[in-house]
Swiss-Prot record:
SUPFAM superfamilies: TPR-like. It comes from Escherichia coli O17:K52:H18 (strain UMN026 / ExPEC). A lipid is attached at C19 (S-diacylglycerol cysteine). Residues 1-18 form the signal peptide. It is a lipid-anchor. This is Lipoprotein NlpI. TPR repeats lie at residues 62-95, 96-129, 234-267. PANTHER family: TETRATRICOPEPTIDE REPEAT PROTEIN 6 (PTHR44858), UDP-N-ACETYLGLUCOSAMINE--PEPTIDE N-ACETYLGLUCOSAMINYLTRANSFERASE SPINDLY-RELATED (PTHR44858:SF1). Disulfide bonds: none annotated. InterPro entries: Lipoprotein_NlpI, TPR-like_helical_dom_sf, TPR_rpt, Ycf3.
Amino acid sequence: MKPFLRWCFVATALTLAGCSNTSWRKSEVLAVPLQPTLQQEVILARMEQILASRALTDDERAQLLYERGVLYDSLGLRALARNDFSQALAIRPDMPEVFNYLGIYLTQAGNFDAAYEAFDSVLELDPTYNYAHLNRGIALYYGGRDKLAQDDLLAFYQDDPNDPFRSLWLYLAEQKLDEKQAKEVLRQHFEKSDKEQWGWNIVEFYLGNISEQTLMERLKADATDNTSLAEHLSETNFYLGKYYLSLGDLDSATALFKLAVANNVHNFVEHRYALLELSLLGQDQDDLAESDQQ
């Protein structure tokens, strides 16, 4: 091949590759990963000052430790959050919300029996604490107790049938019992709902009503700012990951769980359990291992 023709061939190939990469970047829906805000940092500093003072009753100190733990958790600082929750519980052992968080952490670590006990404690202290049914249901789901998981997640769904994510978690549990029946129940829940919340688009994808491309187009159109985009992506990528996992497509599932985590929406259920899914899939790199141990 003559030098000039060879150069033209290489230039054309590079141009086509560049166009392909550019096209991919333009079509991909991405958000800037969420970062700590100045307001959150100021609140943490103020909490530290208040906790350092001695002018707090035990109840006030326990409550403030809990609130700081919640803030740490939202920033992904689970070791610090767990330390605050443990201190709060040592002062006031009757705080159901603290047991709820500790149960979530135990589930993420794969310590399911201890997680069940934590959520049992939540409901003993406050039978109306409905999110304990969600979190215990998820722990039972990952712990392989499918029928018990269904019972808890059904109770959680019945508390608000218009919440699409309650239907999705119930479907995931029932899918392990009878996939065909689970999809029919999901369809009934969709038809009965008001369909106002964004997550019903994910349900429509699960039902085969819309394509993945349409789902992502709706996601992009619905997001009002970067925060809502990051949240929607965390949710959507997690449930897409579960969908592909059910098809046996481990590579796609793994990639989607990583994308769910990448948005840093630390306090979302989908972020928490995308990490667990990656661990179960063998993606236990150092950062995942540290997360499970905290």
